[in-house]
């Protein structure tokens, strides 16, 4: 034990299968867990999920970089619109993304929208070069993103004369973002990878959802991997009392399928 050996596929598969059966017999299926890549195909995710659940385990997850799992049982998170619809947006607020690096193809579509007059806005740790004109950019350390987004929500509430979801201070930049979103016709609030991986991701999600609702915008998730949405469709994450990725990595299972 403790050493890597190069073997043929049959030997490797039998070794893994026997190991999983042993853990199931000694600790029930709950002793098993699976950390699956969100880049995997739908078939791979579905088969792995089916295997674990038939062995009695709900310890399955693809959210390997997430830190906040408190709202994991919500609706499927996706872009919220067809990809082609990005070209037709006239207002876009991106939260927590180096758009040009993280999502170059989506960035190109938003860039096309900007060329046709769309106002692009961002909340990030720093002002990134997205190779497109920016209407407004709010920079804050990641630990302050919840306060910053709450400020944008408060600015929206102030413009509309309604109660904000939480009381928060806001400045001119937040006011510019709020007014732009309220005046647009086709608009979106998009959460990037850094927002989804944030330690207060659920709070950012709730605030973004409120802003989108009150401004008539579509809420979307840019998505970190090729099959993030597919993983949700086949329930490759805990649906009952299973452990999430962070809990499994803390050593709460006896064996992990990677």
Please provide the spans of the model-predicted regions.
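Catalytic alpha/large subunits of respiratory electron-transfer oxidoreductases
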Residues: 1-258
């Amino acid at each position: 034990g403790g050493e890597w050996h190069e073997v043929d596929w049959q030997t490797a598969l039998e070794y893994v299968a026997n190991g999983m059966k042993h853990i199931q017999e000694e600790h029930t299926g709950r002793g098993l867990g699976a950390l699956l890549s969100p880049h995997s195909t739908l078939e791979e995710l579905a088969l792995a999920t089916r295997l674990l659940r038939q062995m009695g385990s709900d310890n399955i997850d693809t959210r390997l970089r997430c830190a906040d799992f408190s709202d994991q049982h919500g609706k499927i998170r996706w872009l919220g619109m067809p990809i082609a619809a990005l070209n037709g947006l006239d207002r876009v607020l991106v939260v927590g993304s180096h758009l040009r690096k993280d999502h170059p193809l989506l960035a190109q579509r938003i860039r096309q929208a900007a060329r046709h007059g769309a106002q692009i806005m961002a909340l990030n740790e720093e002002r990134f070069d997205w190779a497109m004109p920016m209407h407004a950019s709010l920079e804050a350390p990641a630990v302050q993103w919840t306060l910053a987004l709450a400020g944008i929500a408060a600015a929206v509430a102030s413009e509309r004369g309604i109660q904000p979801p939480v009381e928060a201070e806001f400045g001119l930049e937040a006011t510019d973002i709020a007014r732009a979103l309220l005046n647009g016709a086709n608009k979106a609030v998009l959460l990037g990878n850094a927002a989804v991986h944030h330690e207060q991701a659920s709070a950012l999600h709730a605030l973004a959802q409120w802003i989108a609702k009150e401004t008539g915008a579509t809420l979307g998730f840019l998505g970190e991997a090729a099959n993030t949405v597919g993983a949700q469709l086949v329930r490759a994450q805990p649906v009952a009392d299973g452990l999430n990725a962070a809990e499994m990595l803390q050593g709460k299972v006896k064996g992990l399928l990677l």
